[in-house]
Amino acid sequence: MASASLDRLFHPRSVAVFGSVKRGKIGHQLLTQLVEGGFPGALLAVNPRAEAPEGLPSVPAFAALKPSAQPVDLALVAVPAPFVNEVILSCGAAGVPFAVVLTSGFAEAGHVEEERALARAACQAGVRLIGPNCAGIMNTASRLYASIEVRALPGRTAFLTQSGAVGGAVLGLARERGIGFSTFVSYGNRADIDEAELLEYLSEDPQTGVIGLYLESLSDGREFLRTVQRVTRRKPVVIIKAGRSGSGLRAAGSHTGALAGSDAVFQAMVQQSGAVRVPGMEEMLDLCEGFTRLAPLAGSRVVIVTNSGGPGILTADRAEELGLEVPPTPETVRAALREFLPAHCALANPIDLTVEGTRENYSRALRAALAGEGFDAAVAINVATPFLDSVALAEGILEAASELEGAEGGRVQGGPAQPTAKGSARAPKPLAAVFMAGEIVVEASRRLKDGGVPVLPTGERAAAVLAGLRDYYRHRERPGGELPPDPDPETLSLAADGPVLEPDLVDFLEAEGFPFPPHAYARSERQALEAAGRLGFPLVLKAVSPRILHKSDAGGVVLGLRSLQAVRRAYAAMRGRLEGQDLRGVMLYRQVEGAVEMIAGVKRDPAFGPVVLVGAGGLFTELLRDACLRIAPFEREEALRMIGSLRAARLLQGYRGSPARDRGALADLLARLARLASRYPAIRELDFNPVFVLERGALIGDVRLLV
């Protein structure tokens, strides 16, 4: 849908409010917000008795809305739920293109069919809907405050929220911190317009520099991923996702299912999309302010300039936990610092100016650190006391930012700009401030914000902002686009109710190009001995039974068989152990030695479809929980990034003298698995555990399928 399609929603020429306009009612609150917010267009109150709103003499009242010379672009609906459809149909008859339905009592209260009827009525009437069960919308450029929440300050952040209460809390917190918004949308139950359509529109809105989003659920996860992938190529998206706890996970029938819980899948979507996820409201405001005020971050090396050692160390610790670097101060910078800092100041990074640090110390230290090539960003920390002039220290930081901007021929602050052109001599560098100690730093903090420098309450939160910038700009530089279109679904010939037997599954997967060690299926001892003679030794013997899910736990796997006699004994012992387990025979494999064991698998998520997993494999899969997920399909480059994100990647690179293993072969297997899962929607879960990664090639050691 074209981005211009929502223009009249956010830039209406006139607004009609449906519902009671008595003081204290939602209709009256909406009109009060619009009048006091300075909405420049026409306002109308519509209710059956044509009651005029108390205390708002400029707003005319009507018993019904009729087509007129003054068209209405937006209806705000705050009538009881049984009357909403009637209002929407009347809006359609009057040519109103948009309605925001604040009324509750629909799907959120269990009345799903009533909400479907509302959506049908809106479609019939040609009216696009926000809501129901929402808190309204705002657009500060249009002075449209069509919401029951506190009016937003003007700014360059757009905020979309499923929860009206969370939206109100964010607006209140932002107002306390002086953070403004371009657009606010509480979209509630999204009976029509959803977060994906709003994101597309805001991605092209010139008033919006960054988009914040509070989510509780998604109606179409795959389409949402594609949308966010497109949007983040143009501007940052910062997401809060509720429901991270283990109570949202289901019981799983495979290793992949156990590792790929619902929140883990959502996190994979975030990483794949280029969005940045934060845990809560304050962190979202931190990062949105960072994106609107800070220059793009070109690297990960951070210098910390502080007047107190403890907060500097805490900041450094958190920065490194988040994958940022806090490298030693280069000798060239140390030499410059020695020219003006007292001998007792620590220069290592953090650079500790001590409590005696002055305006000049901050200004010159920041300029010395950021002027060269040793650092990509800075955090300036001031732990104030009643005896320090924090305003003067703030002026020193602003002075450094201003002079660096002029010296580098570009803005030190002011993101989110387009990516810095490759080959430019100097890139702008982010500079964030941390001013602590409550009331005594209020004026200093205000001056910093007015000068374009964001102020965070702790160094740890400043580090999180820089890490968020790093993640976003690093992802935006990667080649590649959105999730490919889903292939036409194919029927799985193995489809059955329950586990598929290993011999059939291996034959199917080999035909699809997946590699296995030399193997054979034997239904009797004689067949097992004949197969062993053909395959050679050592061998692995594995039970084939529809009742056994984890073979090693049940005694259904025997390793290291090096003779026909050993195979005969193992076969007889296995039949005895598994009596009554519906043993259908055994699989024999040539045993793979000298490999790194990994796991690869796929799980079908209800919101995002097929999700591929790679991680540390073998016996320690769920113990170590070292795994990475991606939504399928994807290609080899994405698979290589997945592998590189694992702690187990060090084993593949060659560890303590061991040879490097074939990461490329593992990546090819993952990409092939992603394509397979996309073609066969009947696959619910598929495990390859272990996958033996060799110096050349990779082989699947065990496989399990649920359909």
Language model regions located:
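Catalytic-core regions of core metabolic enzymes
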Residues: 1-707
